[in-house]
C-alpha cells in the first residue's frame, strides 16, 4: 500500500530469521521494496536519519526518533512511551493500514519539523542518577540490610 502512494525505495531491514521465513514461504515484494540484512547500529541510525519515515516495532523507537529527530511510526499494538504520543513524536498504529497511511500523510505535511519529548533532552542524567543512588545508600543499608 505504501509503495502505491510513495515513489521511493522501501528498505525492509530484516532479521535473518525473517529473511529465512520470507524465502521459505515464497513471499514476494513489489519492485521498490528492498530487503536489507542487519547493519551496524551507526549505519542503521544513518538510514533512519536519511529516510522519509521509519516504521518499526522497536520498543525504543519513540526515544530514538525524538532524540535523533527523524520521523517514525511505532507498529506495536501498545506501547510504554505515552510521553511520545502526548507531543506527537511517534504515533503507534499497530499493523492497521489506514492508521499507517494517515500517519505517513501527516509526516508528509509536517516535513522535517519533528517535535521533541522534553524529558529526553535532559543533559545531566548521569549526575542525577549518581545523586539518587548515593542518597539511597544509607536508607537501604539501614532498612533493607539492617546495617
Per-region residue spans from a language model:
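Nucleotide-activated sugar donor-binding and catalytic core shared by glycosyltransferases
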Residues: 1-8, 12-13, 18-147
Amino acid at each position: 500500500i505504501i509503495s502505491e502512494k510513495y515513489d521511493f525505495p522501501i528498505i525492509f531491514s530484516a532479521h535473518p530469521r525473517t529473511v529465512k521465513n520470507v524465502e521459505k514461504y515464497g513471499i514476494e515484494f513489489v519492485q521498490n521494496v528492498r530487503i536489507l540484512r542487519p547493519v551496524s547500529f551507526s549505519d542503521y541510525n544513518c538510514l533512519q536519519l536519511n529516510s522519509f519515515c521509519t516504521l518499526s516495532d522497536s520498543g525504543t523507537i519513540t526515544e530514538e526518533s525524538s532524540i535523533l529527530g527523524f520521523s517514525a511510526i511505532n507498529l506495536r499494538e501498545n506501547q510504554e512511551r505515552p510521553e511520545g504520543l502526548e507531543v506527537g513524536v511517534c504515533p503507534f498504529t499497530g499493523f492497521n493500514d489506514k492508521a499507517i497511511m494517515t500517519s505517513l500523510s501527516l509526516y508528509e505535511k509536517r516535513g522535517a519539523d519533528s517535535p521533541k519529548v522534553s524529558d529526553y533532552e535532559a543533559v545531566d542524567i548521569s549526575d542525577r542518577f549518581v545523586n539518587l543512588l548515593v542518597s539511597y545508600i544509607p536508607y537501604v543499608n539501614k532498612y533493607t540490610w539492617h546495617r
